[in-house]
């Protein structure tokens, strides 16, 4: 199996974006705008005065974190989680852009709208657990929904992921952090579609 690199992931994201704009992949107007905004943000990085930089390795970090977990239900149960192009596109936006001033992430709030049966809870659980454990920026993570039952779906998904995988993850992460060279770029580090809002709040 080919080793997945940061370059390969960004090429996947770029190809996905081009398919959205060409019409090869059907998408609503708002999603097309999101793709256009991503292209615009990337192009702006060429300007020396741009206050942001892009770290593809940070996107790879999240991808590798997701791969350490396995599907817990459905026909893929037991298989490692492989981010779809759409979810990789979200990750590339959320985790790739940083501020030159202090190395903090550019985007602090994320709005994700996705139809039912697209593993929303699983994806949000991956993001939430990623914010708590391996990132250099530690956060408190709050999960809110229209009802306690709805928000509990994400919470239970997090528990399911961790209880099934935590031992291996702790060992792998400890080894990885011990041997990984420091990165110079970062200075700190219902039938209808359901709407989720995530806010990452810096822990005191």
Regions found by a protein language model. Give the residues of each.
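Phosphate/NTP-binding elements of NTP-utilizing enzymes
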Residues: 2-204
């Amino acid at each position: 199996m080919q080793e997945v690199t940061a370059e390969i992931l960004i090429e996947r994201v770029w190809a996905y974006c081009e398919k959205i704009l060409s019409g090869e992949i059907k998408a609503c107007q708002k999603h097309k705008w999101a793709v256009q905004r991503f292209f615009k943000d990337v192009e702006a990085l060429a300007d020396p005065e741009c206050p942001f930089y892009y770290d593809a390795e940070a996107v790879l970090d999240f991808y590798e974190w997701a791969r350490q977990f396995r599907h817990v239900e459905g026909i893929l149960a037991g298989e490692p989680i492989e981010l779809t192009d759409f979810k990789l596109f979200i990750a590339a936006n959320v985790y790739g852009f940083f501020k030159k001033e202090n190395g903090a992430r550019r985007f602090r709030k994320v709005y994700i709208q996705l139809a039912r049966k697209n593993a929303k809870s699983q994806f949000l659980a991956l993001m939430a657990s990623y914010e708590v454990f391996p990132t250099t920026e530690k956060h408190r993570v709050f999960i809110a929904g229209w009802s306690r039952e709805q928000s509990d779906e994400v919470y239970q998904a997090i528990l399911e992921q961790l209880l099934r995988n935590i031992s291996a993850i702790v060992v792998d992460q400890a080894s990885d952090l011990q041997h990984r060279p420091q990165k110079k770029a970062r200075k700190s580090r219902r039938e209808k579609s359901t709407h989720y809002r995530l806010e990452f709040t810096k822990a005191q």
